[in-house]
């Protein structure tokens, strides 16, 4: 059975694709992994079957529309929060396109994600609600859980534009075993000149690796790993010693192992040119046996776009909850959620 390795190879080396490629399978995989716009950008200008070329042209147009929408939402948030005088850091896809980074080319962008100081959360929430955003989660338990334990406010959606915003005060749940220093992330952010900022190049990768390996179950992880590939390649091109800057930043936030594993996986799947520092132990790229399990999870997609390898996916789902909270809290949380679902 096919897996998403064909998609990873197509992204890494578009010229390797033959005209008789299983285009239907490749496109279906890319759509399921939210990488269709990215694939369309990577294949632009190459000889393609006519129907594939038309489909990918539409995908590029859709990605461009998504880019404009994301930037407009960022501007709306900026206007709502400007009177507060608090730093507002764009995260994820919106940050990539706002900063003009390669990782933003064709990228699928969903919610607007921002990072603000924790002490400003109440004021930020009030300002957004006054500007037309409203709560998505009316359930009192979910609302209380977010506010006490999560790294973000309960999600908000704009009443007229139907666009969501996630307001973060750090990058991992407060229950996680790792506690990144959000104050450092905000202090080191790069100003865009319009009242908004983005994380530093190293912090962007740290955040992406945290989201990929220290928080979630790797669902949609191929897109996150492609982000890391692009971000690293662009930063290392400007600074050959960027790898050392990156691992220093990762260590500051307790995410050294996650970042190094992400670099290994990116190298293995996309051929990312990462300079190793084996002797110092700072960047060891020698494959680990467990890397195979992560690759197996990342590539768990068939040419019909269906998720495959259910046992592997379940194992990583359990792992994600184990990383997010202590066992006793996890058991209590799952029990409450199960009981409420039966009510």
Residue ranges: model-predicted function:
Residues 1-110, 116-343:
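Conserved NTP-donor binding/palm subdomain of two-metal-ion nucleotidyltransferases/polymerases, i.e.
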């Amino acid at each position: 059975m096919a897996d998403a390795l064909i998609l990873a190879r197509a992204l890494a080396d578009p010229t390797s694709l033959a005209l008789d490629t299983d285009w239907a399978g490749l496109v279906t995989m890319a759509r399921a992994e939210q990488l269709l716009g990215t694939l369309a950008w990577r294949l632009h200008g190459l000889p393609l079957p006519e129907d594939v070329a038309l489909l990918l042209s539409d995908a590029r147009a859709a990605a461009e529309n998504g880019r404009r929408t994301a930037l407009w939402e960022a501007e709306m948030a900026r206007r709502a929060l400007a009177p507060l005088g608090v730093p507002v850091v764009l995260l994820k896809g919106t940050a990539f396109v706002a900063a003009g980074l390669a990782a933003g080319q064709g990228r699928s962008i969903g919610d607007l994600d921002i990072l603000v100081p924790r002490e400003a959360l109440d004021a930020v929430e009030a300002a957004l609600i006054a500007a037309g955003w409203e709560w998505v989660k009316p359930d009192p338990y979910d609302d209380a859980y977010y506010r006490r334990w999560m790294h973000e406010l309960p999600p908000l959606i704009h009443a007229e534009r139907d666009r969501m915003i996630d307001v973060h005060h750090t990058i991992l749940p407060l229950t996680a075993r790792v506690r990144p220093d959000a104050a450092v992330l905000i202090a080191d952010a790069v100003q865009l000149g319009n009242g908004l900022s983005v994380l530093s190049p190293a912090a962007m990768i740290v955040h992406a690796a945290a989201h990929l390996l220290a928080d979630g179950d790797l669902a949609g992880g191929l897109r996150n790993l492609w982000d890391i590939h692009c971000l690293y390649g662009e930063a290392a091109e400007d600074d050959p010693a960027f790898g050392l800057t990156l691992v220093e930043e990762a260590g500051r936030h307790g995410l050294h192992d996650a970042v190094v594993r992400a670099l290994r996986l990116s190298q293995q799947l996309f051929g990312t040119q990462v300079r190793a520092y084996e002797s110092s132990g700072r960047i060891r790229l020698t494959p680990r046996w467990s890397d195979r399990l992560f690759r197996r999870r990342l590539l768990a997609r068939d040419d019909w776009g269906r998720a495959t390898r259910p046992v592997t996916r379940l194992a990583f789902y359990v792992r994600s909850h184990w990383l997010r909270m202590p066992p006793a809290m996890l058991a209590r949380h799952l029990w409450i959620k199960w009981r409420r679902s039966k009510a």
